[in-house]
Amino acid sequence: MAPSRSKKSKYKKKPRAKAVSPHKDEESMSKTKQRKRKLSDMLGPQWSKEELERFYEGYRKFGKEWKKVAGFVHSRSAEMVEALYTMNKAYLSLPEGTASVVGLTAMMTDHYSVLHGGSDSEQENNEGIETPRSAPKRSRVKSSDHPSIGLEGLSDRLQFRSSSGFMPSLKKRRTETMPRAVGKRTPRIPISYTLEKDTRERYLSPVKRGLNQKGDDTDDDMEHEIALALAEASQRGGSTKNSHTPNRKAKMYPPDKKGERMRADIDLAIAKLHATDMEDVRCEPSLGSTEADNADYSGGRNDLTHGEGSSAVEKQQKGRTYYRRRVGIKEEDAKEACSGTDEAPSLGAPDEKFEQEREGKALKFTYKVSRRKSKKSLFTADEDTACDALHTLADLSLMMPETATDTESSVQAEEKKAGEAYVSDFKGTDPASMSKSSSLRNSKQRRYGSNDLCNPELERKSPSSSLIQKRRQKALPAKVRENVLKDELAASSQVIEPCNSKGIGEEYKPVGRGKRSASIRNSHEKKSAKSHDHTSSSNNIVEEDESAPSNAVIKKQVNLPTKVRSRRKIVTEKPLTIDDGKISETIEKFSHCISSFRARRWCIFEWFYSAIDYPWFARQEFVEYLDHVGLGHVPRLTRVEWGVIRSSLGKPRRFSEQFLKEEKEKLYLYRDSVRKHYDELNTGMREGLPMDLARPLNVSQRVICLHPKSREIHDGNVLTVDHCRYRIQFDNPELGVEFVKDTECMPLNPLENMPASLARHYAFSNYHIQNPIEEKMHERAKESMLEGYPKLSCETGHLLSSPNYNISNSLKQEKVDISSSNPQAQDGVDEALALQLFNSQPSSIGQIQAREADVQALSELTRALDKKELVLRELKCMNDEVVESQKDGHNNALKDSESFKKQYAAVLFQLSEINEQVSLALLGLRQRNTYQENVPYSSIRRMSKSGEPDGQLTYEDNNASDTNGFHVSEIVESSRIKARKMVYRAVQALELLRKDENNNVNMEEAIDFVNNQLSIDQTEGSSVQQTQGGQDQRLPSTPNPPSSTPANDSHLNQPDQNDLQVPSDLVSRCIATLLMIQKCTERQFPPSEVAQVLDSAVASLQPCCSQNLPIYTEIQKCMGIIRNQILALVPS
């Protein structure tokens, strides 16, 4: 039974909305075309070859000064010249050797040929399209005096008129006696044809007649022609030959019912034709049409969408709901009119129009038959006229740019009405046929995105459709998302979402495929209640794109993003736990991998770059080319720019043996060139290196090398530098010293030898942050070798410690306590630790380091002698030139010339400098010769905290002889103790001077007091030294000066001293340095001991504030001079 009429009272009739004039769209399209043609219009007339040549010459001469370039061309303005440059900017940006005037001429010739060729072809193809636009407007046709059959009872608002000036195809279709079969659409059987359409006339409402008489534009004629075609189609919407009801079209309704039915037919036809596949734009003309007819429909596409389509949607959304049987007849007629094929009974009568969901609760209407088949279909005599009108309308829609809003809304309106009408008619449809139909529906949906029918409230084409679609996908339940990812269905056309158990069944949602966009949630929620009013409690409408869910589902979707967000927060806030088992397993796997020879070999090929080869492999020619052209800063290039770049770079080489051979030859030439630069730098012929060359390795630099025999990677130090090889001392004593090629030596810190051009692209601070341990070890290694003996501290002790040497925890604690209580006592502990660490080294390490120092001293002397030999050779050549000039009779012409004198003086000055270098190298070599005779650190003081038995430090006596005299530790400690006492006495004298008023008398007394105290300290120190000479391995824990010394030291930090503001610690260290220098000059000590004492004195003067570093540098220079002078007096 049909639903009760009480439901219809809910909706009020509203007048049909007025058609919106399409002038705005035409204006926007014209503006868009104007913007597109702007650059070509700015070019002006076609450029000749001479003008292009002059433009290119002027551009290369004046650059981007367009006024000057235009003046150089003479016949062009600055705007035209700039437009030409903008069009060929990518090509003109190339360097002058790559780009040429020939290429510019060729590019412009191609541009004009494509421009003219494209316009000619368009003119030929669209010849029939341009004719109606330029034709004058024809006179309006007044209302017809001959009403057609069946239209007598219509009211005025349902009458239509047409124009004979804009759409001649509609008029022609109704004046021809028989349809003309064209091309492949020749029917296989004879087609019956009716002559009723010749007598059919058009009607026009009085309101529109009055407006047209005043003179409206041609766009209204387009609208009325479409309305007329649809009205005729609705009047003759009888069934096809399949239904065998040819007389159904003669069935008449009352005027009011007939008007409602006609409007519904118009809306249905517009919706179906707007949903036609866009791929059929270029299809052949429909049955009964010619090429000329199809060419006449160029301009009316926007008119349709703004005319009848939008008004139909607005009317449909607010209109009434029709009975099930009547709408069913209408749907059947309209569908068969559009398709007209024999395929309808193959799928079953109910299945070809509707689809049922899997549980049989939700049904949907689907347009099943494609247009490709409909174009080849055959029609009966009763329906061919209506099909002609619909085909004409279809041809018009295919030529129009489909407006998304109107098309979507029209389709949505039709689907909503169809679904409401048929919701209870096909309740028991066969599930098997439904699954078959569903599969067909899914395949069509993927192929034809615009054929889907959807809810008008849910489908709105907007710029933010993609964003809304992403939001809707995020709002899916987590379980659904996991299932989609798990089953790899992200690219499928539907996602099944479970709903609440309120009789709504399953719901299908597309995954953003095709031209449909996601629905807006506001309209989704606003219209959901309205859609439920038109459905029964057991059956619900499920649209193709997205259905209106129940209130429970809406609440669930609203709350879902919050749940997902909270779960994500919990995951991110979970603390990171380090599993020791996984770390150990990873270390084990890594060690197992490194144990493989192939893995190590692969690491060498991947990351090992020698200092000389690194700039070659780090060079990127393509990046250099982009920088040269000026496109290096552009993150993304256009297609035209890529084309110009590819054409300028040429065809890429094939990776072949010949290619590798040529690249190797280039690499060998590069290496020879770099070595030549290095040799010139070493000989003094070159002041510096180019910016793109790596700096050579220096002597004593830490490197990573490939061992020439084992071909494994090992660490080592550079001992000597040769032309193409280095003498490397490996850290492993078993490997010894080997000559290694310069292509197999890599610096431990690549930044030290990196070229200046590449170093600028590196963040030096980031490297230090990422490699703090490596950098610290490298700095220690650089300082470990100084004048042939290693400098050690307590921080590097663990690197050189041996199993037979241990430091007790109590001693470490003692060091902390002493450093916290008295900073001055910390120096003695540090020195004791350093000395003990050195004495506890294995003898092999000392021998290796001694050999390294010997080789270094010898290499420095050899290099100095080579330089001196070159200078002497040059000096000899100059002398020979003077002698030859005198023999030739020039007398002293050459000798008296100013240039010769300057050159000769420069050579002599260079010779004097080289002589100094040779003398220093000889001195270093002599020091190494005496170093082997004496072993430093033969004795050491023991310093411990009283009362702790473990606070003692043992050592092994290294067979020191009595002839060595004072040891380094004795000199350092005695000097520091004496300096502290002197400062303490001086501070006491200053206090006395501040208290008394008679400063002259007190000054003399203070000086006498200080001298007396110093003399007493000297006598005490001599007695202490005598008692220390007979002691064995264990020594007292405190030095022999009086026990009041620590107390005296503690007095230095009293408030009185703070009031005086005397830097007693710094003063005591400076005085200790002077005392050390004095003691080193009194007797001839071994050079190693002298150097060590002076270095310890300089190290003690290192400032805490960075502002004092320049002063400290000057002190170091002065101490170096003093050391050289002292060592020069030492006999070899």
Curated annotation (Swiss-Prot):
CDD domains: SANT (cd00167). Its main location: nucleus. Residues 433-442 have a biased composition (Low complexity). GO terms for cellular component: DRM complex. Residues 42-93 form the SANT domain. This is Protein ALWAYS EARLY 3. The keyword Nucleus applies. Expressed ubiquitously in vegetative and reproductive tissues. It comes from the Eukaryota. One of its GO terms (biological process) is DNA-templated transcription. Residues 522-535 have a biased composition (Basic and acidic residues). Residues 1-43, 115-157, 234-257, 283-320, 333-357, 422-476, 500-554, 941-963, 1018-1059 are annotated as: Disordered. It is found in: Nucleus. Interacts with SNL1. Residues 236-245, 1018-1035, 1047-1059 have a biased composition (Polar residues). It comes from Arabidopsis thaliana (Mouse-ear cress). Keywords: Nucleus. The gene is ALY3. Residues 1-17 have a biased composition (Basic residues).
